[in-house]
């Protein structure tokens, strides 16, 4: 370009070039050039992965600057500071090159100067600059600072605790019967959890954060509350004939009808398949009529779902099924069985929908919303109160957080006349709007609503937005991908730009060729310049099948597909691109086939619990669909299979997940070895040619690195593969950090035994375990610090008495105390950072850490601790004590700082990272692991859900009868969030697969390959190869393999799935070596490349085939003379193989991890019965115990409906409305009275009353307990034959505590616990001695339920307490060594003795 005419000394007056007159640079594609040169309107660039969007954005900026726009008149918003710095540097480089060609152009020099103050930054940084400049308009202290995330999190929790405390105080004051305080009490009871109110606090914070993502947070809160008020209004409205009820307009019913359409479409597909089988030769034609009737019924339901909830409810109320006719004549049994299975699934789905959504009338559903309205109003009040208190606390400390920056900026840009939905710009906004010639936004798909409002106020149809909605994976940070989608749908495709106006602002006319007004233009950058053709074809083949508008929030159509644009030169001897590998790891089933898959176990535990877990303890039958509710994702054979096996405990499930990660890591390690051994060629653009693959070319991606990355590191270490994982955790567990924190705790307070012992044993002071034992013996009863002083005193006295040298340990201890005292003085006088620096210098610990294995990382961690101390003291807090409390609170809340990063880009190691952290990066070889791990749907299990559009979704909770069930609002929000979560997971998978440049290897685990393959075949049956899978199949997915498997069924290379489904190859067969080495068909052919179809190779491996893959590390290392030289150079000399052997050691007692060391009788009493209940045991042989099969699984709380009288109010006493004791508390009062009863006193009702009053005066009984005593029942007991025996006994022992050790195998027979013991603790009500032995007595206050047969109740009581008395019997004879001649219960409520 000729810059002589353009870049002269007076840039203001020169003629500007029109974009359409700029000649096209051949290095850019047509679409890229359009994105670079288009002007005069809002422009949305949908840039696919690897499309070079950053280069396009920089080139556009350079072009605008060349047109005469000063660089400081451009607002460029990036997602990260690193992206902003990179963009600024690229612009500087381009301007510098231009200046080199035109050295006399002062205008170019001016742009380089202006670049330093150009607004190329993150949105938060822009907001911060604006707030700093106009702080006085916001009534902010000019010395404010942006709080650290950890600091603000701790302050937020403090403020929230204070707000809750104020609401508790208001509740305790009882200001009126309908006060907000009482509603707060009900709110805590309903949503506060069983142990504390932290679940409710989480809800408050979640709602608060959700509100802050809206431009008008308070108005948004009032709007979502208004939906519940509107529901109440609709109940009273009269409906005219032919009109729909007013409540039909409530958003939750419309949302649920949309979800019903998806469910009914699945039922239709099942029945259509069944009907086609009926009509096949040999099919059960007699079933055809019933299946046809079912299909017609389903279609009618589908039509009703599109009309109104009223019609849909009526149709479901009339739901009935036609009986099938008997099959006569010859028939294919396999077809008959398949038709029966399909029809059963369809009927079950319909009946499940009926039970979950339609057992209760619409009026009842709306009434539920009015019932929870006061609680939702109180919740909003709490959120608003927290907001006010939080803002006040931040102002007091002169702090702002990132949310404040956005909303303060918004306040500056909004005029006082602005109102919700009407963002009127302020004078400042108008000024900035005129100043900025263009507003450019990178990663636009990750923008939220507040940020969108800010950018809109700063622009005048001069926005340029770049992003890829398929890579929007930050919904958890409240990003709103729909902002991108709405513009993409409303903007017209770019055609021909109109003339440029003089302000580089609003367009003279629109982009349309007809001149019609459109809101903006869109440009698709579909060409991918990163990956090989086969990688792109594989991504297209997969997402064309799974990304649909309903399941993925957009269609993966021609505009969304990736187009090959990279230039990979041909390599001699190589025929084409590497194939995509999909590895299925087979977890070997048990011999009886009862082992359950990880996926299915998690299905039942998480997903089904998430959707069905709201229906708990319905008070009356039919009031709410409490049972047999369906999973939102539908039914599947794997779901059914999962019901046959017992579910594992949480600990067992975690072990299964870790085991799966271990074998996937082992396979990945072997595959990496093969790639390195074969010297797989990769193209290096910097070198301009091919080179052998290096470790740094390889990345392992996983959905979450927590708990998995460490396992991969361990396996890679065992295989001698260098690897690095940035897990963002593990900092506090690092040895060097733990030692320094212990030392700081000792400096703060030396009377802390554990930190003190840790410091003494540390490399800083190097005391041995024997030294510590001797110190403790000097003073066994006091603190360890006292023991040190006592040891020194005793050693000095002994030296004086015996005229011998002082014990060397005492000398070292005296020096230790002197050093600690000096540091304590320094801590009081100087900064915390200086204290830490002094410790590093005086102890040499920093240098010592550098000489340890991994010394660079350790020193980086120590530097991070020093930096953290400096940052801490930059806050409003000071001092060592507060810093340590800060660290402790951070750890208590599960926080971590993450190990310091020391890895450089060029270091030759395999990277292990989460998919989120990989966004924006690229690697020649990408492994995606954990594809069989289930999606995390735990949030759907919350008692109260929140949605940006549908508002609040609570459950109805009756704290007296102890049941809960979801409102229609929660049902709707639950389904909507489920869909949005799966859409996000689909985009995360897209990001993972598009990181690969040359080779993609996928790893996933299934229980049995054959069963998984059969399910995938069912899911894809009848679907054309080029068509998307049904939404109901996609929404049923529990893991990524549930999408990948069905999508590959119709692929030419997916035939392997059919072979697996048929049982070939045989499961458990030895894994062929060439399956690992990939010696055949490594690349796709030229014809396949031309056709555009992707090439895959599918493998499976059973667990037993992977066990032998790990290399064993030797245990001995001969002496090496080089060590002496390393010692002279102060380098570490520890043999790495010995370190590896130690670090790879596996804990041998994993099987005992779920066994309690101590357990109360009340926790296990129902598990124990005699082998022969009718034969009482002899005193010589204590009774043996077993767990009855019916009690192996504890009864679910959801199946029990305790009587209100049996429930304990979990609220604090001062919050309880009714101070009457519960049945449990009354029983405790009776036991307490009988424990202190004087058996020699007067036995009459008056005498019992007198003794009870005496115990009240002695404060052994409370007044409430005294009033709960039934004196007649107690008198009846004392006057009974058993009571007479008790009063005449030779010796009486009451409330006898005991501790008994039992073999763990008796308590946990399912564990491998040979040789282990469990401590059993309990209290025996009464033991009394007679002439011929001891009698064991247990008195009970149970009462027979109304309407229940007494004999049946007595039998239930006997069965219930038999195990408890058995344990008491065994304890007495084992501990007291006395003979128990008999055992009995006394039922106080009926005055009856029961021998056991």
Swiss-Prot record:
What is the reaction catalyzed?
Couples ATP hydrolysis with the unwinding of duplex DNA by translocating in the 3'-5' direction; ATP + H2O = ADP + phosphate + H(+)
SUPFAM superfamilies per the record? P-loop containing nucleoside triphosphate hydrolases, Restriction endonuclease-like
Q: Which organism is it from?
A: Heliobacterium modesticaldum (strain ATCC 51547 / Ice1)
Q: Which GO terms describe its cellular component?
A: cytosol; DNA helicase complex
Q: Which GO terms describe its biological process?
A: double-strand break repair via homologous recombination
The molecular function terms of the Gene Ontology recorded here are:
3'-5' DNA helicase activity; 3'-5' exonuclease activity; ATP binding; ATP hydrolysis activity; double-stranded DNA binding
What name does UniProt use for this protein?
Answer: ATP-dependent helicase/nuclease subunit A
Q: Which UniProt keywords apply?
A: ATP-binding, DNA damage, DNA repair, DNA-binding, Exonuclease, Helicase, Hydrolase, Isomerase, Nuclease, Nucleotide-binding
Against PROSITE patterns, the record matches this protein to:
UVRD_HELICASE_ATP_BIND, UVRD_HELICASE_CTER
């Amino acid at each position: 370009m000729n810059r002589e005419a353009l870049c002269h000394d007076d840039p203001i007056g020169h003629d500007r070039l029109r974009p359409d007159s700029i000649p096209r640079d051949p290095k850019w594609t047509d679409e890229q050039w359009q994105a670079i040169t288009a002007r005069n309107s809002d422009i949305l660039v949908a840039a696919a992965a690897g499309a070079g969007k950053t280069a396009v954005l920089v080139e556009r900026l350079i072009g605008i600057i060349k047109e005469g726009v000063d660089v400081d008149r451009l607002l460029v918003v990036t997602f990260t500071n690193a992206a902003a710095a990179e963009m600024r540097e690229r612009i500087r480089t381009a301007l510098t090159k231009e200046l080199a060609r035109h050295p006399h152009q002062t205008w170019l020099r001016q742009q380089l100067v202006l670049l330093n103050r150009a607004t190329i930054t993150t949105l938060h940084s822009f907001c911060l600059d604006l707030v700093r400049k106009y702080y006085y308009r916001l009534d902010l202290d000019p010395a404010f600072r942006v709080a650290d995330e950890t600091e603000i999190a701790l302050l937020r929790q403090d403020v929230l605790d204070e707000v809750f405390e104020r609401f508790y105080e208001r509740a305790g004051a009882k200001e009126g019967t309908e006060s907000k305080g009482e509603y707060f009490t009900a709110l805590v009871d309903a949503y506060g959890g069983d142990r504390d109110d932290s679940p409710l606090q989480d809800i408050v914070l979640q709602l608060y954060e959700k509100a802050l993502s809206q431009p008008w947070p308070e108005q948004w809160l009032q709007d979502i509350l208004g939906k519940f008020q509107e529901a109440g209004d609709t109940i009273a409205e009269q409906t005219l004939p032919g009109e729909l009820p007013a409540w039909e307009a409530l958003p939750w019913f419309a949302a649920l009808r949309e979800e019903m359409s998806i469910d009914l479409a699945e039922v239709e597909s099942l029945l259509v398949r069944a009907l086609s089988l009926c009509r096949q030769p040999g099919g059960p034609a007699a079933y055809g009529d019933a299946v046809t009737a079912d299909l017609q019924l389903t279609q009618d339901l589908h039509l009703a779902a599109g009309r109104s909830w009223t019609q849909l409810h009526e149709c479901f109320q009339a739901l009935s099924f036609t009986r099938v006719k008997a099959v006569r004549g010859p028939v294919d049994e396999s077809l008959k069985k398949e038709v029966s299975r399909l029809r059963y699934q369809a009927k079950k789905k319909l009946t499940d929908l009926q039970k979950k959504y339609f057992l209760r009338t619409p009026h009842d559903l709306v009434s539920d919303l009015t019932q929870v309205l006061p609680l939702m109003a109180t919740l909003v009040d709490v959120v608003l109160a927290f907001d006010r208190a939080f803002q006040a606390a931040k102002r007091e400390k002169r702090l702002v957080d990132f949310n404040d920056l956005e909303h303060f900026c918004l306040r500056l840009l909004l005029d006082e006349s602005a109102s919700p939905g009407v963002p009127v710009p302020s004078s400042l906004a108008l000024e900035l709007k005129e100043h900025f010639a263009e507003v450019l936004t990178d990663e636009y798909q990750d923008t939220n609503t507040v940020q969108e409002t800010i950018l809109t106020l700063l622009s005048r149809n001069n926005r340029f937005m770049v992003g890829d909605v398929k890579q929007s994976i930050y919904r958890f940070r409240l990003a709103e991908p729909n902002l991108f989608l709405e513009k993409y749908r409303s903007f017209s495709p770019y055609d021909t730009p109109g003339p440029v106006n003089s302000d580089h602002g609003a367009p003279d006319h629109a982009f349309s060729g007809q001149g019609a007004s459109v809101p903006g233009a869109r440009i698709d950058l579909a060409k991918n310049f990163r990956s090989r053709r086969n990688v792109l074809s594989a991504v297209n083949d997969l997402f064309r099948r799974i990304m649909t508008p309903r399941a993925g929030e957009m269609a993966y159509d021609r505009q969304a597909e990736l187009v090959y644009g990279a230039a990979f030169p041909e390599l001699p001897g190589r025929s084409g691109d590497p194939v995509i590998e999909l590895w299925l790891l087979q977890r070997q089933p048990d011999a009886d086939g009862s082992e359950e898959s990880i996926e299915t176990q998690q299905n039942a535990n998480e997903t089904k619990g998430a959707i069905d877990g709201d229906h708990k303890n319905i008070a009356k039958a039919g009031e709410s669909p409490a049972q047999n509710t369906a999973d939102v994702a539908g039914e599947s054979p794997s779901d059914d299979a999962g019901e046959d096996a017992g579910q594992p405990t949480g600990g067992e499930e975690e072990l299964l997940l870790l085991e799966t990660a271990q074998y996937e890591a082992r396979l990945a390690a072997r595959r990496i070895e093969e790639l390195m051994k074969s010297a797989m060629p990769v193209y290096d653009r910097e070198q301009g040619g091919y080179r052998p693959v290096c470790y740094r070319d390889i990345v392992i991606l996983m959905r979450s690195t927590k708990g998995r990355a460490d396992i991969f590191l361990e396996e890679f270490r065992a295989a001698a593969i260098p690897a690095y994982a940035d897990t963002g955790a593990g900092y506090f567990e690092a040895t060097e950090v733990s030692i320094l924190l212990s030392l700081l705790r000792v400096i703060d307070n030396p009377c802390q035994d554990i930190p003190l012992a840790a410091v003494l044993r540390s490399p800083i002071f190097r005391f041995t375990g024997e030294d510590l034992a001797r110190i403790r013996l000097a003073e066994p009863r006091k603190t360890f610090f006292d023991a040190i002083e006592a040891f020194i005193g005793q050693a000095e006295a002994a030296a004086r008495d015996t005229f011998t040298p002082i014990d060397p340990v005492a000398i070292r201890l005296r020096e230790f105390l002197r050093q600690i005292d000096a540091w304590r003085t320094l801590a009081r006088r100087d900064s915390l950072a200086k204290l830490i620096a002094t410790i590093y210098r005086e102890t040499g610990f920093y240098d010592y850490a550098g000489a340890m294995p991994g010394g660079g990382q350790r020193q980086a961690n120590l530097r991070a601790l020093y930096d953290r101390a400096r940052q801490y003291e930059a806050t409003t807090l000071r001092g060592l004590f507060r810093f340590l409390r800060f660290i402790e609170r951070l750890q208590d809340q599960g926080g971590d700082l993450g190990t310091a990063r020391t890895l450089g880009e060029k270091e030759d190691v395999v990277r292990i990272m989460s998919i989120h952290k990989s966004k924006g990066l690229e690697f020649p070889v990408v492994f995606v692991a954990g594809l069989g791990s289930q999606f995390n749907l735990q949030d759907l299990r919350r008692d109260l859900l929140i949605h940006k559009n549908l508002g609040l979704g609570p459950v109805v909770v009756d704290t007296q009868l102890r049941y809960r069930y979801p409102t229609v609002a929660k049902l709707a929000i639950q389904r909507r969030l489920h869909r949005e979560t799966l859409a996000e997971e689909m985009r995360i998978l897209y990001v993972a697969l598009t990181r690969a440049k040359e080779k993609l290897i996928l790893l996933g685990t299934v229980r049995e390959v054959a069963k998984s393959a059969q399910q995938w075949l069912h899911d894809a049956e009848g679907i054309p190869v080029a068509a998307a899978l049904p939404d109901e199949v996609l929404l049923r997915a529990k893991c990524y393999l549930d999408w990948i498997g069905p999508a590959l069924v119709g692929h030419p290379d997916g035939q392997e799935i059919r072979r697996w489904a048929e049982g070939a190859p045989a499961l458990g067969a030895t894994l062929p070596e060439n399956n690992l080495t990939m010696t055949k068909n490594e690349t796709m052919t030229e014809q396949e490349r031309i056709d555009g179809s992707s090439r895959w190779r599918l493998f499976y491996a059973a667990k037993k085939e992977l066990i032998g893959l790990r290399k064993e590390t030797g245990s001995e290392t001969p002496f090496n003379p080089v060590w002496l030289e390393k010692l002279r150079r102060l380098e570490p000399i520890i043999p790495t193989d010995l370190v590896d052997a130690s670090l790879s050691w596996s804990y041998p007692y994993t099987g005992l991890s779920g066994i309690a060391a101590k357990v109360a009788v009340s926790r296990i009493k129902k598990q124990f019965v005699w082998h022969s209940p009718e034969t009482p045991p002899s005193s010589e042989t204590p009774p043996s115990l077993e767990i009855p099969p019916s009690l192996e699984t504890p009864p679910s709380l959801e199946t029990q409906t305790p009587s209100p009288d049996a429930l304990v109010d979990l609220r604090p006493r001062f919050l309880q409305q009714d101070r009457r004791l519960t049945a449990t508390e009354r029983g405790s009062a009776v036991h307490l009275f009988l424990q202190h009863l004087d058996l020699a006193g007067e036995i009459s009702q008056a005498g019992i009353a007198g003794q009870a009053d005496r115990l009240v005066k002695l404060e052994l009984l409370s007044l409430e307990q005294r009033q709960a005593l039934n004196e007649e029942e107690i008198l009846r007991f004392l006057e009974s034959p058993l009571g007479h025996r008790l009063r005449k006994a030779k010796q009486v022992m009451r409330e006898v505590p005991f501790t008994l050790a039992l073999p763990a195998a008796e308590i946990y027979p399912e564990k491998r616990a040979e040789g282990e013991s469990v401590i059993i603790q309990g209290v025996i009500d009464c033991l009394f001695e007679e002439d011929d032995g001891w009698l064991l007595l247990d008195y009970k206050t149970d009462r027979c339920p109304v309407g229940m047969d007494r004999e049946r109740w007595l039998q239930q009581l006997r069965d219930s307490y038999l195990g408890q008395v058995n344990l008491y019997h065994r304890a007495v004879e084992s501990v007291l060594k006395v003979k128990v001649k008999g055992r009995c219960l006394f039922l106080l409520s009926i005055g009856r003795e029961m021998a056991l």
